[in-house]
């Protein structure tokens, strides 16, 4: 038996699991058993320190994942069965040399994560979204859905407040773009953020949300809470609830948006629109809640419009032209994110919705990528009414003239 497993077994034999066990007590028992084992097996000081940490993590934390969770350079952790762990650093994927001791240990960690988020995961409910205490987002898939063993994906979020300046430092966009985004938020433009999986939609949503004036009443709606708004006292956070084992007590995004509208919000922020709740979000934007923000999966600003149209049709039989009219009056600006060739997350496109043209939603490009892969200003905002109404017009005039279009 490996020393780690031997130590773990002896520690567990010493503990009384019928009583609450503090971290301090557990660490004391581990240290005591390490001293005993070192009398049987010669151990270096470095071995004792390593065993102490590994056994504590195995019994109280998330085992081999704990070091990765505490490593700020790791942004994503992917577990494909107990033997295969991959991590993302600076947009690049790497295979992690460590792995779980066996399938049983992986399942223990999965159940620990799920129960900590009040989620149930089993064969009857094999796909679960959850979050860790630090806000990291977790997706779990169990066999037989996951053919080669249980999988768990953990998307971490920065511990420091995510601001537009923070994103500038990581070269997601320039300071000029950051100033423009702040103006859009301050002037209460309704904004949709689009992008693929892992493109940074939630991170940008966090950064933009932290530009909201501190005296407003904000309601956030998410499937798994991960937004971190700082300095807003009048903040209400709502989270979707999955159905229980009997298929009851579900509270979906559509219901949460309906509840939010009755709670006198200044703005509503929806973490991600995925289905028929898209119509509820459009209604919220159309009924006096200017400055609302949401995100969705799409490949471009134009594709985001098609996606919203499809999502609305998932819940209601409504003429397509009527849906497009709702979008044209509800959404002011769409911001698209993507990944560049080196894997880094970038802001790729900003477009303004200017109304309807020939039964289509009219998109007016404000910023686009040029031939040098740089985000370049193409045009000023057409609708500047909100800029003037909310005192942001002068700030917007500080920008230089738009660049001529590439030929």
Give the location of each predicted region.
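N-terminal accessory targeting/assembly segments
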Residues: 1-121
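Conserved, well-folded catalytic cores of nucleic-acid-processing
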Residues: 10-17, 36-40, 58-65, 80, ...
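P-loop NTP-binding catalytic core
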Residues: 71, 84-187
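Switch/connector loops and helix/strand junctions flanking conserved nucleotide-binding motifs
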Residues: 85-88, 227-230, 302-305, 342-348, ...
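P-loop NTPase nucleotide-binding module
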Residues: 127, 136, 156-158, 163-228, ...
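Switch/coupling sub-region of P-loop NTPases
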Residues: 188-191, 207-330, 336-338
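Conserved P-loop NTPase
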Residues: 328-398
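Conserved small/polar residues in nucleotide/adenosyl-binding loops
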Residues: 399-406
